[in-house]
Amino acid sequence: MSAAKRDAQSLFPLFLKLSGRACLVVGAGAIAEPKIEGLLVSGAKVRVVAPRASSIVERWARAKRIVWRRRVYREKDLRGALLVIAATSSKKLHARIFRQARRCGILCNAVDDPPHCDFYYPAVVRRGAFQIAISTGGLSPALAQQLRKRLEREFGPEYGAWVAQLGRARDRLRKKNLNAESRRETLHRMAAGAVAKISRHRIHAPR
């Protein structure tokens, strides 16, 4: 088994809370745009370093949604960042950012450059709190995107509403004088009912 395949199969999946956390993006062009946008959606405090930026990134900077440092990357830009995204066309720069981030204990993702990644961006279906993340461990991002498009057709906005409804029910149960076992059984019964409802919806939904 190749090192790339071995790494892809040993990835640890998780969802990070980035709200209010500092994240660095090196690059401000078309490659960087979706990465910056994803961080903004997650509530991160985004710093961008690049001599030039796309019109969209410039607009985010003018609106103060991001901090744009209009110059080349320097190692000191890593200070205080939880993670860094290297989103340029230079593999040489990506390698340098990766090495420096490693020394600082900062996670790094270099776009389309798996050897210089501590983590990968999954393809995500978002329906409120209901999210499905698809990863191929960097081996085939195109496949992950195709699967995302298929799942987006199958899982509509109603799934987010159902999850929100279950969340409210869970909060109500927590306030009741139930022992842990009874509460767990009730929650699982409600979840099973939601799954059955989802299954019926999928059967009768137009294709």
What are these regions (language model features)?
Residues 30-31, 92, 138:
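Residue-level detector of alpha-helix initiation sites
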Residues 46, 68, 107-108:
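Hydrophobic beta-strand scaffold residues
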Residues 50, 68-72, 112:
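Short loop/edge segments at beta-strand edges and connector loops
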Residues 59-79:
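Glycine-rich, highly charged phosphate/nucleotide-binding loops
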Residues 110-160:
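E1/E1-like adenylate-forming module used to activate ubiquitin-like modifiers
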Residues 138-207:
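An accessory alpha-helical subdomain
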